[in-house]
Amino acid sequence: MIDPQLREGNSVARLLARMNREAKDAGVPARRIHLVFAIDRLLARLLVSAPADSWVVKGGFANQLRRPDDARFTQDIDLRIAGTIDTAPMLVADAFGTDLDDLFSYGSPAPPTPLEGPPGGGLRFLAVAQVAGSELVRFKIDISASDALVGPQESHLSDPVLTAVGYPRSSFPVYPVAQSIAEKVHALTLPRDRENSRARDLVDLVWFAERFSVSSSELIDAAVATFAIRADHPWPPSLSTPPASWAKPYARLRTEVGLVPETPDDAIAAVSTFLAPVFAGARGLRWDPTAVAWS
């Protein structure tokens, strides 16, 4: 149930005023809050329209659910589905067609496009979120099938900003930390025909290492499964020196999420320390982000 006052008078103006106030107080662009709401309310629909355990949040938005105050902001949503990729259009259509009486509605102006990479195939949908019939924001929904998923899913609540504006928080299924790290390791080390431009993968790995305790055994299991199903380069991989072109994007993202390493070279050194026992297959250890060490 949303705050009844949001339904009084001009509901669009009232909701936008509240969201924009929260954005101003947080010192972030209003679009950021609009996206958080649009993605959250879509996921809330999936909780109703799709069977339990048929989907899970992964990627950047999973990290925002874990730590909304300092995760790298993402402008889209990544989902892994339990079924085959051909079931994704119906999953999305059912969510779009679910009415939660929350002022939001969803549609798409174009058919989905294929994604390269996911072992079971992937589709990208363009979602248009509307509030009381007026467009609020657009965002991408990337859906993959058959990605490795080792270990129990986590459950995380909506961003607290939902409550501040007058909406209930939901609890969403989220990729395990170890699986999220394994996918980042795979993305960072993936051989490419051109220069790797994904400085964000390095940023995310440092972010994980500075904030989460994780078992080396869980990381090894998740990584081995990920590399096996992707089958594009062997496990364990090697870490390369970051390209010089990463200096500016790394500096910007470092400021956004609050990382210790000052440069990409410092960051890759930190990641090397974090991953060395994992690459070596050393089980039974636990990472301590405060001590920055395994024990």
Pin down the residues of each PLM region:
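Structured mid-to-C-terminal alpha-helical surface segments
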Residues: 1-55, 65-295
